[in-house]
Amino acid sequence: IAAGVRDDQAYIDAVVAQVLPGVPVHVQAPQFACSAFVAVDAEGRVRTGRNYDFKDDTSALLVRNHPRGGYASIGFAALNNLGVNTPLDSFAGRAAALMGPFAQLDGVNECGVSIAVLTLDSKPCDQDTQRPVINTSLAIRLVLDRAATTQEAVDLLSAYDMHAMAGRDYHFFINDAAGDARVVEWDPRDPDRAFKATPVRQVTNFYACYGDEVLPNQKNDELGHGKERAVAIADVLDAHVGAQDEAVAWKALRAAAQEPNPEDITSNTQWSVIFDNTEPAAAITLRRHWGDVDAFAL
């Protein structure tokens, strides 16, 4: 944050120089898509479901982080954003994988706070209200490292000007052990891109703060698209109110998953993950292989 983050590549180069001095590694600014929701079972156990969708295939990197003075966390990064899908094939690839904590797309920390980033169709946010500046990747890192509740995450993010990376706009789905699920956004209709935190149960690639204006199965200009996937998730969750266990969460993820479409950046579900917010952990499957799930403890 102190180095300045308004220029994506300059920020990335600064991180590389600090983490991997002298190592010839190329890292590009990441891009993101997706669906996300909160589910609560009969015992009150809270889970976050999340599909990461992106048109180009990628390997998924499991990232465990133990920051000094911060909260431990687990999450996932897309290796194509680090310029290497097979990191074990070369020294440069192994070095690039060390950048994983700065390229995470989702995760959950030891307090049960989870976060997932989803892309939008609005112009990229680039606030300038004289506050410190944070970018998309650092927002994820900040929340996982420093927030013990959703409210703390909201308070942290609202203290910064947002710079959206990679020429796209984004919002964040944040949940905690109490099931306080909110979408954090920067209002596209406000000239100053006012900060918004909207309570929701599920969201995809449209503005939650204008959710009532968004129609399914179409583009809604700057307000986004993908409402039909949110409806599919809602149908599953509504059918199991009070009993949304892990099996129901997988059913909801499957209902919103997408096949490849080279013309749609938010197609092609790369991974589907369930984060346990009550007893922090992750269970993940890659590219819609629903019978092949790997589980990871914090």
In which residue ranges do the predicted regions lie?
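Secretory/export targeting leaders with adjacent low-complexity proregions
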Residues: 152-168, 172
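General structural feature for long, well-ordered alpha-helical segments within catalytic domains
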Residues: 149-152, 156, 229, 249
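A recognition module on extended beta-rich or small alphabeta surfaces enriched in W/G with H and D/E
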Residues: 69-85, 101, 208-230
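Non-transmembrane alpha-helical segments in soluble domains
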Residues: 141-144, 154-157, 234
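Long, charge-rich alpha-helical interaction segments
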Residues: 226-247
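N-terminal mature-domain region immediately after signal-peptide cleavage
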Residues: 1-148, 162-163, 242-298
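Extended amphipathic alpha-helical segments with heptad-repeat/coiled-coil character used for oligomerization
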Residues: 167-217
